[in-house]
Amino acid sequence: MIRFLFAAVFCVFALPAAAEVKIAEITSPGGIKAWLVEEHGIPFTALELRFRGGTSLDAPDKRGAVMLMAALLEEGADGLDSRGFAERREELAARIGFDADADAVTVSVQMLTENREEVVKLLKSALTNPRFDQDAIDRVKGQIQSIIQSHAASPDDIARETMDAALYGDHPYGSSDLGTAESAAALTRDDLLAARAATMARDRLYVSAVGDITGEELGKLLDGLLGDLPATGAPLPAPVTPAFPGGVTVVPFDTPQSVILFGQPGVPWKNPDYYPAYVLNQILGGGGFTARLMTEVREKRGLTYGVSTNLVNMDLADSWQGSLASSNDKAGEAVKVIRDVWVDVAAKGVTEAELEAAKTYMTGSYPLRFDGNDNIARILVGMQMDGFPIDYPAHRNDKIAAVTLEDVNRVARERMRPDRLTFTVVGHPVGLESTN
């Protein structure tokens, strides 16, 4: 019965809007810093840990090791094998999840107050003494091999991996987090231990907690949970400048629709142009059916069901990317229309009406992100990694509201680069050939 109560709490509990969230920074007796939002109305806490570096810390000849390691952390620890770990987690009505991406290894925990001490013990065993049993390694390797095979048959994944390789080259961002079939198959238990040592250290740790816990309680919890982790991990990779030469790369693939990815240089978080660019992106490709690209590519011409763009800000690279799918006989026209929109907005800018609609949506939708302990914990730990101040949620909408039409149109002129707009197309697009 307790696990069903937990599920109900997890699903329905929500905190106040962003501006009302009171965030405190605490430092444990052992020196571990964390951001905390106390909410004692429900006996439930979400804890988020993030270790900077992620799969980018794979050794060059061990690609896929960090991803495999993260997947195996819940497959047994100390005296519990894979089944025993899962059963104990179920008994405690806890959620413990591990994940990895190019920039971080993430640990997400949701727990009831009455079971918090035991959940932390279970989590600590996974972080400090994972078993990495060979049968679990073989089983998870098999799952990863299946995913790699499915990616090789997916036009979306082929497009993503082709574009990443072109943008980032030999940098870790340029290859799949999973590795290749060959590199994944060759990984050993020693490789997993090395990956854990490289990534899960206190010098790259960010922590947030939201819920029924005080600062004093959180400090003691963190020292007990994380105090035995290594002080330092492997050096982080150097930043990389994505290569956007302009032009088109076509990857022939038998599919009725061409998958199209496109992009150009981006804008870093901390650059003064970021907020005008953020609003400009909303107008260009982030605003659903009212966005310029949706209007021109879908509504006027029926070339796609949907097209979108995003500012992509990673730890070590920034870009501005978009995607769509179009039938092979229309893909060439879709690429042309996107280029034309890019040229037009760069030259002529956007309208006051477009600006106001974008700002209204962006400021109105922001509080909706703060809809539960776990989501807030993820937001807070992401803010720390990205270097935002602790009061950012209270002032973020002010930054959006302050963006003027002059700001947006200046950034459009200076930042939009039609000459560097680069396309990757997977399919058999009629009338479209590789130029790169």
Regions found by a protein language model. Give the residues of each.
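Charge-rich, well-structured scaffold segments of protease-associated domains
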Residues: G84-G233, V250, P276, K300-R301, ...
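N- or domain-start disorder-to-order transition segments that initiate the globular core
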Residues: A19-P43
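His/Glu-based metal-binding/catalytic segments typifying zinc-dependent metallopeptidases
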Residues: E39, E48-R50, A234-T290
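Sec-dependent N-terminal signal peptides
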Residues: F4-F13
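M16/MPP (pitrilysin/insulinase) zinc-metallopeptidase core fold and M16-derived inactive scaffolds
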Residues: V21-I23, E48-T113, A153, G288-L303
